[in-house]
């Protein structure tokens, strides 16, 4: 796969014939402003000959990226890579999960697994959205979710039974099952755990994670100065 910045994954440059030239891993990250020469990464799909499989030691954990592939290259073995330009996303963080979900809903990432056509949102049976609220940006609402008036859910995942209050704004976030978000609260780039109770007029942004069953009193958390 090709990605904008391979430093988070390690790069795998190939020659014109597709032959792998190196496996470059960045356990110590490169200095800032020094991008890698190759933006190709190892996406973790391999085809091995039986002889290679039989050469992998048994009885311990083996990293094929750190042990097997470097050994093959050092021995002069012919290792080839296929560059795939399909949609790909590393789902290793909550933010990536939310983005991946939105990409599926909107059709950016093609799939046959959606319960309906691609569009701006998926609203599962039993969920209720007030007429003056908006669910957009590839959002998903689980079963029995309640979205009160004047609320906006944009590019987010709201799990079953959550209650979204009047005037709430949820952007690029995940809201857990049966969580409650009080009126006027802003949730952006955040994760709200199952059964969490977030009081009115809070501001939860910038990667905040609220643990399950936590109660946040009204007006307790702010990320911006009051006007």
Feature map (PLM): residue ranges:
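Short, well-ordered turn and helix-capping elements at secondary-structure junctions
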Residues: 1, 24-27, 85, 133, ...
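Short, acidic/polar N-cap/turn motifs at the starts of alpha helices
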Residues: 9-11, 79, 205
């Amino acid at each position: 796969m090709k990605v904008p910045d391979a430093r988070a994954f390690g790069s795998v440059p190939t020659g014109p014939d597709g032959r792998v030239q190196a496996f470059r891993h960045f356990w110590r990250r490169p200095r800032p402003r020094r991008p890698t020469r190759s933006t190709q990464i190892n996406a973790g799909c391999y085809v091995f000959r039986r002889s290679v499989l039989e050469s992998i030691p048994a009885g311990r954990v083996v990293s094929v990226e750190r042990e097997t592939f470097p050994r093959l290259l050092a021995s002069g073995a012919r290792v080839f890579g296929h560059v795939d330009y399909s949609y790909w996303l590393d789902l290793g963080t909550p933010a990536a999960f939310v983005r991946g979900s939105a990409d599926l809903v909107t059709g950016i990432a093609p799939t046959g697994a959606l319960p309906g056509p691609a569009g701006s949102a998926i609203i599962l049976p039993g969920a209720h959205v007030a007429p003056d609220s908006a669910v957009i940006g590839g959002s998903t609402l689980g079963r029995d979710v309640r979205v009160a008036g004047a609320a906006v859910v944009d590019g987010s995942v709201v799990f079953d039974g959550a209650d979204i209050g009047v005037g709430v704004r949820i952007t690029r976030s995940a809201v857990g099952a049966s969580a409650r978000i009080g009126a006027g609260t802003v949730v952006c780039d955040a994760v709200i755990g199952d059964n969490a109770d977030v009081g009115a007029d809070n501001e939860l942004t910038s990667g905040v994670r609220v643990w399950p069953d936590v109660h946040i009193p009204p007006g307790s958390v702010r990320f911006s100065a009051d006007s």
